[in-house]
Amino acid sequence: VTLFPRLVAALHIARARRALLVPMLGTFVLASACDPAPAVGDGPYAKLLGRAIPKVEEATGLTFKTTPVIATRSRDEVREFLLKQLTSERAATQLAAQERVYKLLGLVPKDADLNPLLRRLLEEQIVGYYDPATKTLYVVEDVKPEILELTVTHELVHALQDQYVNIDSIQAQVGDADRQLAAQAILEGQAVYAQLRASMGETSLRMGGWQRARVAMRDAQEGMPVFSNAPMVVRESLLFPYVGGADFVFRFTQRRPGVDVLQDMPVSSRQLLSDAAYFGRGDSVVAPDARDYPAPVTLPAPSKGRVVASNTFGEFETRLIVFEYIPNELAAGRAAQGVDGDRWALVELPQGDALVWASVWDNAVEAAEFVDQFTEWLRKRHPRIGSRDAIDAPTRTWYAPADSAKGRAARSVIVHVETRGTRPLVVITDAPYGQAAGLIDPARIVIDD
C-alpha cells in the first residue's frame, strides 16, 4: 500500500537488485567496463554517469535537461533522512490510520506495529535514493561496485523523471491512495523497465525476458528476512509499484511505442491491471477521455462517532483484502474486477473502530461476484458469524460473536446493495456489536459520474 511511495525504493529495490538484478544485469556491468564512455563532470562518479546516462536516456526515450548530481552519504545519514520522512506528521498520521483499518480487516495481527516494521525494513534495504527536494541522488558509502552501478541506474531514472514531472507533487497527494499508487507504480515501474532494457535489450525483454524477470523479482524476497516475514498486505503493496508498474510500462511500450508514459499516466490501479480500462478493447488505443475512470464516491457524515480517516482501496487493494482470507489469486481477481470507484471511512466510536466502505461497480454480475466472495471472506474471517436475512436480500446483517481466544470483540457487519442509475452500489459497514445499524445512510452517498 503504498503508504509512503517515496520510501518504497529504499525499502525494496535495493535488496531486490542485489538478489535479482545483479545476475541479470551482469552483461550491462561488463559491457560498461569493455566499452568506456566519456566521463560526465569531474567528480568521483563521473565515469559511472558517463556509462549510465546514455543507457537510461535510450531506455526511457527521454534526455536529461540538466546533469544529475550524485553525492555519498553514510548509512546512518541515509537512515536518518528516510526516518524523518517516515515520522513526519503527515506520514505518521496516514500510517496510524492505515494500521487501524488493516487490523479491523484482519490484514495485520492485532498487536502489529507498522512503524517499527518499516524502520526494520529500512535498515535491511538502504542502499540509495533520489531526493527531489535537493535534486540529488544519494548513495551509501562503501557499496560494492556492481550494486552501486545498479543503484545509480535505477535512481537516475527518477532524477530524469523529476525533470519532466513534479515528483514532489505526486508524493504529496492525499485522500486518494489508489491514484497515488498508480502514479508511484509508473515512477518505479519505468525505472525497473529501464534497468532491464539497458541490460537485456528490447528484443530479449519481448522474447520472454520480462516474464522471467517478474518471477525472479518475486523469488528475490527469500533473501530479505524482514520483508519476507512482513504481513502479506505490506509485502504485496511494496512489490506492486515495481512488478505491477514495470509490467504496465512494458505493455505501454508495446501498445504506444514512442509515447512518453509520464505525460499520460494511469490514474487508478484498475487502469494498471486492466488493458481494457486504459488502452480500450481491441487493437486500437482509445483516446484518454474514453478510458474507464473511477467514479468519485463521497460518504456522508456518520450518525455517531468521529471520522478518523477516509481514503480509497481501488482494485489492487480490494484484491489484497479478499486474498487474505481467500488465498486464491483468480478468486480475488474476479472479486475486485469491475470496481468502478470506492471510498472508505474509519469511524472512531466509544465501543471501538468501525469501517464504512462504499464501492460502485460496472454491472450487477461483477457486484454479485464481489458480494459472494466477501460473504465467504466474512465466514473465513469470523468462523461463527451468522445472518438471519435471506441470501438474496438487498441488505444482510451479520453478527460475529466475541472470540476470546483470538482477542476479538463481537462485531456487526451490514452488507447493503442497491442500484444507482445503471450501476450497483455496495455498502459495507463493519462495527462493534450493535453499532452498525444506522451508522451511515446509503441514500446520502454521492457518486460523481
Residue ranges and their predicted role:
Residues 30-33:
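C-terminal motif of bacterial Sec signal peptides marking the signal peptidase cleavage site
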Residues 35-37:
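Bacterial signal peptide processing site
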Residues 59, 224-352, 358, 366:
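Pan-zinc metallopeptidase signature
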Residues 162-168, 172-219:
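Post-HExxH zinc-binding segment in Zn-dependent metallohydrolases
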